[in-house]
């Protein structure tokens, strides 16, 4: 009798890399996961290798277990998802088990996500209507930095974003209110003020 292969996930997702003890992609010390695959192809992208969905390594149960284990360290304020594009449909499906497990295991830690897709127009206005995973994933994301990187609007003085068109959104307050109204002003790398 031959062995039956049972995949870890129904959807295959690659990741480009992991950055531990990251201080550039959200407040405090972060555990950052760079997923592979992005269809935006922004001019001036800092990570063009991640555009390919085949770049990097397969995201496995062992990868997920490692991330969850590492995030148990007290030094981490939270986890950040970026890439690549975490909100690409295949990546949403691949990330959902990880973020659910992360928030169930560490409810006191925050989850940031960077996406070139606009929260109100593309994520809620399109993906949420055709993919049940979108609303489920948003349930666990605390802060979303949205909008494509625009080279002509590049601003190195901005905290946690690359161009002035990008927005920092409190996802949970926005979902609760039913509209985008909870933008966050970042006054210091470790302090967030809701405005």
Where are the language model's segments positioned?
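N-terminal [4Fe-4S]-dependent radical SAM core
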Residues: 5-34, 43, 47-54, 180
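Conserved Radical SAM active-site core
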Residues: 11-15, 29, 47-127, 132, ...
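An anion/phosphate-binding loop that grips the pyrophosphate of nucleotide cofactors and donors
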Residues: 141
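Conserved, mostly hydrophobic/aromatic
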Residues: 144
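A charged, well-structured terminal subsegment
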Residues: 147-157
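A short, gly/pro- and small-residue-rich
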Residues: 155-176
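Single conserved hydrophobic/aromatic residue that forms the stacking wall/gate
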Residues: 184-195
């Amino acid at each position: 009798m031959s062995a039956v292969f049972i995949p870890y996930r129904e959807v295959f997702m690659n990741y480009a890399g992991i950055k531990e003890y990251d201080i550039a992609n959200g407040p405090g010390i972060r555990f950052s996961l760079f997923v592979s695959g992005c269809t935006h192809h922004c001019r001036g992208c800092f990570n063009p290798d991640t555009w390919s969905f085949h770049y990097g390594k397969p995201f496995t149960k062992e990868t997920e277990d490692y991330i969850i284990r590492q995030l148990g360290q007290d030094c981490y304020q939270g986890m950040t998802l970026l890439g690549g594009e975490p909100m690409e449909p295949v990546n949403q499906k691949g990330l959902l088990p990880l973020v659910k497990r992360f928030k169930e295991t560490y409810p006191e830690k925050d989850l940031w996500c960077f996406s070139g897709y606009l929260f109100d127009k593309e994520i809620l206005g399109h993906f949420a209507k055709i993919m049940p995973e979108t609303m489920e994933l948003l349930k666990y994301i605390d802060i979303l930095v949205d909008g494509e990187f625009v080279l002509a609007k590049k601003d190195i003085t901005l905290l946690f974003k690359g161009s002035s068109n990008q927005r920092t959104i409190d996802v949970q307050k926005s979902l609760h209110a039913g509209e985008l109204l909870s933008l966050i002003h970042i006054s210091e790398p470790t302090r967030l003020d809701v405005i």
